[in-house]
Amino acid sequence: MATDVRYDAERVGEWGTPVAVAGGSYTVESFTLPDGAKLHLRVWRAANPAAPTLALLHGLGAHSGWFNDMANSLNAAGLHVYVPDHRGFGRSDGERGHTRDWRSYPADVSALLDEIGRREANSKLFALGHSMGGIFVTYAAAEDAKRVTPRLAGIIAMNPWIKNVTNLSLGNTFSVLFGGMRGSSRQVIYPYDVNTMTKNPEAQRMLEADTYWGKTQSASFLYQVGLRMRGQVMARAKEVHAPALVVQGEGDVVVSQPATKQYFETLGSADRTFKTYPGYSHDCEFETDRSALDQDIAAWIHAHSA
């Protein structure tokens, strides 16, 4: 949609105001994981109980508040939309940007998908992952392919974090390698830059004031997720059987666009689609006119729900 979202200093970390469609609802919930940790969860429900359902997984340092406007748009297009904050991010439980075991994230996503599947038993379930979330949905789909009855009707990888364009400094790289292998919780400043994330000045203002934005991650997190988990994503991509839509912004200077195309070509999905968007930055949820992307995502989901 073409958006007129503006920075609102009173709504920290919120890009857009969540709204419920006619006959639907918007709620903020807390989802309890098997180990007792609670995930902050935003839920947009469509008027039709059998509408397709989308689980939207954010990227590194982000949180669900960045996707309010996009979720509003997808909900208005006839989808139920669930957007969690990952463990250790945003308003969810967990040490900030820290883990000693990358496997906690696939486990969390699996538990969440199980819960959504129980709630939306008459709905087709899809998962969209932005950046780091693209890794998470790939693992989820690879695991799902081994099930007798898969949960996912399809996945969408949006500017997936397959390979960086800008890397950590040499000193921080050594810190991640040696500290990460020891499970160090020492925080490492990741090379975030609002100017590379988005060209939207209103979104840049929101980001610069966002106290929920995780601008640092621990050496252990970057080792476990950024190196170990991400290092296996191509192998997991080969195991994906579900239909897949891969989207890449042509203005993205955060992740490697050739690596995204290689990821697409590696996917084991027989039904796969690759789409690019001229001028779209890495954090395309902040585009001033995101209508082409939102329409394509909704149309693809509806087509695969028939």
Task: Give the predicted meaning of each segment.
Residues 1-33, 37-46:
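An N-terminal hydrophobic leader/cap segment in hydrolases
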Residues 51-59:
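Short beta-strand element of the alpha/beta-hydrolase
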Residues 61-64, 90-124:
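Catalytic nucleophile-loop/oxyanion-hole region of alpha/beta-hydrolase
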Residues 131-218:
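Alpha/beta-hydrolase-fold enzymes
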Residues 240, 246-248, 252:
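Short beta-strand/loop motif that positions the catalytic acidic residue
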Residues 242, 256-265:
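Short alpha-helix in the alpha/beta-hydrolase fold that links the catalytic acid
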